[in-house]
A protein has these predicted regions:
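In a subset of proteins, long, contiguous C-terminal domains/tails are tracked
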Residues: 89-146
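Proteins synthesized as precursors that undergo proteolytic processing into mature forms
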Residues: 1-108
Length: 146
């Protein structure tokens, strides 16, 4: 292994911190090439779909391996979209109609990543803060807030 331009990373960590006004969300995920995909889905679940941190981590996921993998043997499967079984059948059918090769993963698939996140949110008064956390059931994760 060496550190050099044009080489693949040995690790793919991608911790993130999202800031908006008084709110803060720290989140991260193990999962190789699925890390950023899983983190984006959890982020959108909280910010756009207004899910709680726990709901956001438990929500059904999709993942693609269309680019060559970061790890030997660098597998890539163009056009394949993995979807957890909780994605409704009519959605999967529409994805196939749009040209995707859909493979159904079991619910809470380990390979869909394991997002953990903590939100520090304003409460009812300016002096109060609320910590809310989510632990992904796909991995051995725990959430602890106060």
């Amino acid at each position: 292994a060496c550190l050099q331009a044009g080489k693949r990373p040995r690790l793919t960590p991608a911790p993130a911190l999202a800031l908006k006004g008084e709110g803060v969300m720290a989140f991260g995920c193990p999962g190789g090439d699925v890390i950023v995909q899983a983190m984006l889905q959890a982020f959108l679940n909280v910010v756009h779909f207004e899910m709680s941190p726990q709901q956001a981590t438990e929500a059904a996921r999709v993942a693609t391996f269309a680019f060559p993998g970061s790890f030997f043997p660098n597998v890539h499967i163009p056009g394949l979209l993995n979807v957890e079984a909780r994605i409704p059948e009519h959605v999967r059918t529409e994805l196939v109609a749009r040209g995707h090769n859909v493979r159904v993963w079991p619910d809470y698939e380990f390979d869909a990543g394991g997002v953990s996140l903590v939100c520090d949110l304003p409460a009812h008064t300016a002096q109060e803060r609320v910590l809310a956390a989510g632990a992904d059931p796909r991995r051995t994760n725990y959430a602890w807030g106060k």
